[in-house]
Amino acid sequence: MALYDRANSRNAYAEDSLLRESELVSFVKTTYKFFAGSLLLATIGALLGLMNFQAVVQYKWVFFIAEIAAFFGLMFSKSKPGLNLFMLFAFTSLSGVTLVPLLGMVIAKAGLGAIWQALGMTTIVFGLMSVYALKTKNDLANMGKMLFIALIVVVVCSLINLFLGSPMFQVVIAGASAILFSLYIAYDTQNIVKGMYDSPIDAAVSLYLDFLNVFISILQIIGIFSDRDT
């Protein structure tokens, strides 16, 4: 008779749905806590780096290699609670330090206000794209392949411009990168609220990289156009 007890079946389904919804809410909250912590530690890393500007510039490749090592350490420690959080914060702290040469260049050309301008613009973009991801009825998962192909194109163009050294080509690359990672913000945000990530740390590092790359792109554009004005 239990097979035909529709009330019990509905109650069990409702309880299961509520449980899954509660778990997802907890997942999203934890993700954004880790994301906020990552931004905070990156800011601290950048401030400490600016206070020791000459040393950071002199050993910038050492810090860059350390950042890459921390990133791969984070990837390999995904399934190790505690260690993965440590590697996340180590990576984000080092990424703040490696921003110092770019920050110093922009400050020298456009002043400290340009940093706040870039940060404000990045925050606005992040907020708008996050809201779009939550409000849209479109399934942004279909963008995944297109975004990945665009990412490869941007990386290849960036490598080519290392040899060309063209400021205007760099503006095009930075503009394309800003648009690309703005779209990634929406893409990753929707994936997070759909529960597509294995852990909050995976989700947080995706959001952090999106935010960081939009910020870097805007800084590069400001720096190049400030140079043209001088």
Curated annotation (Swiss-Prot):
Which segments cross the bilayer? Answer: 34-54, 56-76, 87-107, 111-131, 146-166, 167-187, 205-225
User: InterPro entries from the xrefs?
Assistant: Bax_inhibitor_1-related (IPR006214)
Is tRNA processing there in the keyword field?
no
Tell me the keywords, alphabetical order: Cell membrane, Membrane, Transmembrane, Transmembrane helix
* One of the GO biological process terms: regulation of proteolysis
The answer to whether keyword Cell membrane applies is yes
The subcellular localization recorded is:
Cell membrane
Question: Topology relative to the membrane, per the entry?
Answer: Multi-pass membrane protein
Q: Which Pfam families match?
A: Bax1-I
Q: Which domain of life is it from?
A: Bacteria
Per the similarity annotation, which family is this?
Belongs to the BI1 family.
Report what the protein is called: Uncharacterized protein HP_0920
